[in-house]
Amino acid sequence: MSAEGSQSLAAPRGRPSHLLVPARTKTALALLYDEGLENAYDVRLKLTKEVLTIQKQDVVCIGGAPPGANHRTVTLRRQPVGGLGLSIKGGAEHGVPVVISKIFKDQAADQTEMLFIGDAVLQVNGINVENATHEEVVHLLRNAGDDVTITVEYLREAPSFLKLPLGSPGPSSDHSSRASSPLFDSGLHLNGHCSHTAPSSPSSPIANEPKYEKRWLDTLSVPLSMARISRYKAGTEKLRSSALEVLALDGASTGVLQFSTAQDCADWLRSISTNISDLTLQHMKMANKCCSPCDQVVHMGWVNERLQGADNSQNFRPKFLALRGSSFYIFGAPPVSTLDWGRAERAYNLCEVLFKVHKFWLSDNYWLQANLYLGLQDFDCEDPRSYCFSVLANHGKSHIFSVELGSELAVWEKAFQRATFMEVQRTGSKTYLCSWQGETLCFTVDFALGFTCFDGKTKNVLWRFKFSQLKGSSDDGKTRVKLLFQNLDTKQIETKELEFQDLTAVLHCIHSFIAAKVASLDPVFMDSQSMARRYLCSS
């Protein structure tokens, strides 16, 4: 794994150029796993701020050969010491072609400068061996005489079980650079049946012969703007071990990228997520320039929503959430045009929803249940995901979401809080129809005044209390709520009982206004109630 510096941009006004942090390119080797074929092969990843690129090794001609010539024909002169100077693996019995697995430095194969580890052997002295077994190719090479002509083509997607070395690109390579393969190497550096005893001239490149070089070539570039990451096998709740997949907005996928350790996977997950978040933030800033102050996007991004099947089975599906203006939106795909904002699967008023952190991992073996808002009914969150939150909406509707990182959970928590507080202050008050003992009443929650109840017909105020006077509440979970207020003069508790068509929306609204009021008076207190952010800061 490495990071390569790229050219730095001009320094922003007010910042010295020597303090400018250059853009960085992150690279690493990984396995690209084909879940259908259950096969994997080596790739190199290249991560920039905007793109994740998949690279595969290939042998390219750097001069002396017609463009597009993929096959190379090389004549080897067998040497008394070292033979052909190479080893091979594979064969038809393993479902792969015979490939060169080792090239020994300064011996016959190395001296040609035209053969590479990973080359598939296609012909030996004009005999096609593409479907030959390992032993058949070994026998043919050992008995091919002093001069052996082989035709090869680089195998770009060599199965990982071949354990071919991936050292510095070039003809020579340290044959001990990787773990051994279950397929043995047949060493052809030993002498075959030579007809002479005098030392043979080495296999040297001819001046006008084509020159080749092994390089990492870009094969797929996945744009990260509005992209999402998944660590789970599609359609299941099976967590891939040390693996992830990146899916672009247009549906393009990196495929399953398998890392050597869980730590490497976590490192790349964080790096890719950070770049996606940065690009999303840029998109939000551009969109907000065209929106009114009351219609700004506060936060948006991908999550996974838990869906309940008819047979009580549970599975998660990707959803795109957005907090904009007065609403919380749920989309099947990111909104990229003005019209898309009217095509949300769900839209809720921010004052009437309740955000709850449910759980996040403290370590590999322990998780913390975090009921962020005490005093309200707990919500069952039985799911296998690591970082979960729920959004409780009107009429008891609920949505459970998961994210890939604890940092994302903290960001969503803060974003919901900020968006809700902004909407409360913009709205100022909300009024709901209610009834008691057959009378139609109006109940108002006001950011400045607190609670007011007045007659729906005469508009006469029946009672009014400040937020600080609310000392408790209880409800039947359906339509009826009891609010307990303390009279400022008598210090006695007064009970006010009301009925609402959508009790959940009213309770959430009360909570939103009280939380916004507390935050306006003591912002530090609200931050102290954030379980997710508190854990992330301590860890």
UniProtKB/Swiss-Prot annotation:
A Gene Ontology cellular-component term: cytoskeleton
Domain PDZ residue range list: 73-156
Keywords: Actin-binding, Cell membrane, Cytoplasm, Cytoskeleton, Membrane
Gene3D superfamilies tied to this protein: 2.30.42.10, Pleckstrin-homology domain (PH domain)/Phosphotyrosine-binding domain (PTB) (2.30.29.30)
Subunit structure: Interacts with the dystrophin protein DMD and related proteins DTNA and DTNB.
Protein name as catalogued: Gamma-2-syntrophin
Organism placement in taxonomy: Eukaryota, Metazoa, Chordata, Craniata, Vertebrata
Family assignment from sequence similarity: Belongs to the syntrophin family.
